[in-house]
Amino acid sequence: MTATVVAAAATATMVSSSSGLAAARLLSRTFLLQQNGIRHGSYTASRKHIYIDKNTKIICQGFTGKQGTFHSQQALEYGTKLVGGTTPGKGGQKHLGLPVFNTVKEAKEKTGATASVIYVPPPFAAAAINEAIDAEIPLVVCITEGIPQQDMVRVKHRLTRQGTTRLIGPNCPGVINPGECKIGIMPGHIHKKGRIGIVSRSGTLTYEAVHQTTQVGLGQSLCIGIGGDPFNGTDFIDCLEVFLNDPATEGIILIGEIGGHAEENAAAFLKEHNSGPKAKPVVSFIAGITAPPGRRMGHAGAIIAGGKGGAKEKISALQSAGVVVSMSPAQLGTTIYKEFEKRKML
């Protein structure tokens, strides 16, 4: 390990007790530093697994529990190709007419699963994610809220050093390709197959954007809830790359909130990769414009700390990248519709 990496890691350790967000920034930078001449950027190779469709085969970790049972039933009714699930000690049984396995590795071998959704209590959720990584499941969606940040630091450290498994979440609603595949807790009936890619840190605001784009007749191509925790597996840039490369996605809605610097990074990415006459229209809303500094607002990552992470700075960065920022979540649908109208895309 180089001296640079050691110094960065030591600094992150000192800061972690006083500021989780500062630690997150330092750790994320550390992960991108060179170690022994090798840049650990292979995790970006797993972005392709974010896209799901009718052929995606899913297993559920925590299958026989209350949450796992309810949401698995909802997924099956939606038409999702759920092929089984895991609950340690209950292997060999049937649940919802599907096989139960003791381990993720066995479930993958027997079902050919390409994705896993996790409904496991917070103290055990990180272990469930690690088990899915061990089994080389291409896509892991963790719904669980309240996972200890120290657990997720370790998970993130491991994720960034491999390129086989992509994690969405934790503390997120999941991902849905309307009419084809639903992985998570979102209400399926408000979605409609269409043209808008939606990515959000907030679950309920995702549903608001979905409902509005359905109402104005644009629908959705893919909707991704990345979660509001400071240590998550997928960020805005990961999703934006998927949307920009997806021919079915003609416009994008990005919903951010105070805390961290994910929105500023997304703005820089859009400025570089989504400009010129063929740029896709992007509309955004940033929650928390009136939030007081130093107070956490709902999500663990939604906090203005050290004078950074405020809504105004995020809005300014997005606008400088050509993003149309709506001042109200109630206007997301009409705003993206007007952008389509302006560009003669209707």
Curated annotation (Swiss-Prot):
Enzyme class: ligase
Sequence positions that bind substrate: Y207
UniProt keyword annotations, A-Z: Acetylation, Ligase, Mitochondrion, Nucleotide-binding, Transit peptide, Tricarboxylic acid cycle
Annotated EC: 6.2.1.4, 6.2.1.5
Location(s), subcellular: Mitochondrion
Transit peptide limits: 1-34
Listed pathway(s): Carbohydrate metabolism; tricarboxylic acid cycle; succinate from succinyl-CoA (ligase route): step 1/1
N6-succinyllysine PTM positions: K57, K66, K338
Catalysed reactions, as listed in the record: succinate + ATP + CoA = succinyl-CoA + ADP + phosphate; GTP + succinate + CoA = succinyl-CoA + GDP + phosphate
Record: active site: H299
N6-acetyllysine PTM positions: K54, K57, K66, K81, K94, K105
Annotated Gene Ontology cellular component terms: mitochondrial inner membrane; mitochondrion; succinate-CoA ligase complex (GDP-forming)
HAMAP family reported for this sequence: Succ_CoA_alpha (MF_01988)
Subunit structure: Heterodimer of an alpha and a beta subunit. Different beta subunits determine nucleotide specificity. Together with the ATP-specific beta subunit SUCLA2, forms an ADP-forming succinyl-CoA synthetase (A-SCS). Together with the GTP-specific beta subunit SUCLG2 forms a GDP-forming succinyl-CoA synthetase (G-SCS).
Family per record: Belongs to the succinate/malate CoA ligase alpha subunit family.
Name of this protein: Succinate--CoA ligase [ADP/GDP-forming] subunit alpha, mitochondrial
Organism of this sequence: Mus musculus
